[in-house]
């Protein structure tokens, strides 16, 4: 697998983070953005993605599994119980492709006939190397579903170039094939 360092000449600019060692890559062309995007999405095994507002939104579906959510001190693990599918949403800055943290993300699942299965807030998932917003779901069974993702505009989060993520974003993924069950650990 090709490493990011071998991808060419990326400009680096300081971020607005309090950490002076944190930098963001400024991609010089759409071709570089597309190459980096292909790497990120292939590496993370996402099923699809869309650009929406200031974000690049991607989804991943899998069997239900133990999930870990960050809480004070250390991650807390949650058993899926009767839930039979995991839906995860990754949200990147559209321009820098950095993961955007601190968002309120809501997902609505609709069956293939357009009937609402449910709506749930997806908290941030702590998964080393695969940080996402996600949750286990109880779905009627295997099949094609539509996913509606709502990302609320944050109160204080700002992009590296000083422009806020200023408005809520809605994005839909259609005919997402979801297999239900539990991962064996």
Show the residue positions of the predicted features.
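Beta-strand-rich domain onsets/edges
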Residues: 7-86, 184
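Non-globular disordered terminal and juxtamembrane segments underlying protein topogenesis/assembly
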Residues: 23-24, 64, 146, 170-178
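Short structured motifs
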Residues: 43-45, 72-75, 104, 118-121, ...
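Beta-strand-rich structural segments
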Residues: 83-95
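Exposed beta-strand and adjacent loop surfaces of beta-rich binding modules
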Residues: 84-86, 102-106, 144
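Short, solvent-exposed, Trp/other aromatic-anchored flexible loops in extracytoplasmic proteins
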Residues: 90, 119-154
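Short flexible loop/turn segments that cap and initiate beta-strands
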Residues: 93-110, 116-119
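Short beta-strand elements
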Residues: 160-185
């Amino acid at each position: 697998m090709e490493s990011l360092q071998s991808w060419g000449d990326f400009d680096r600019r300081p971020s607005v983070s309090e950490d002076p060692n944190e930098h963001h890559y400024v991609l010089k062309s759409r071709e570089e953005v597309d190459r980096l995007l292909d790497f990120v999405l292939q590496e993370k095994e996402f099923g699809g993605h869309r650009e929406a507002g200031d974000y690049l939104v991607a989804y991943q579906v899998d069997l239900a599994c133990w999930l870990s959510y960050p809480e004070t001190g250390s991650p807390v693990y949650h058993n899926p119980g009767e839930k039979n599918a995991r839906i995860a949403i990754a949200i990147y800055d559209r321009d820098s492709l950095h993961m955007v943290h601190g968002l309120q993300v809501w997902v609505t699942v609709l069956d293939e006939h357009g009937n609402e299965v449910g709506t749930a807030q997806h908290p941030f998932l702590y998964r080393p190397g695969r940080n996402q917003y996600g949750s286990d779901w109880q779905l009627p069974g295997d099949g094609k579903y539509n996913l509606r993702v709502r990302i609320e505009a944050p109160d204080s989060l700002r992009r590296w170039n000083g422009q806020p993520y200023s408005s809520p974003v809605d994005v839909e993924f259609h005919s997402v094939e979801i297999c239900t069950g539990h991962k064996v650990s």
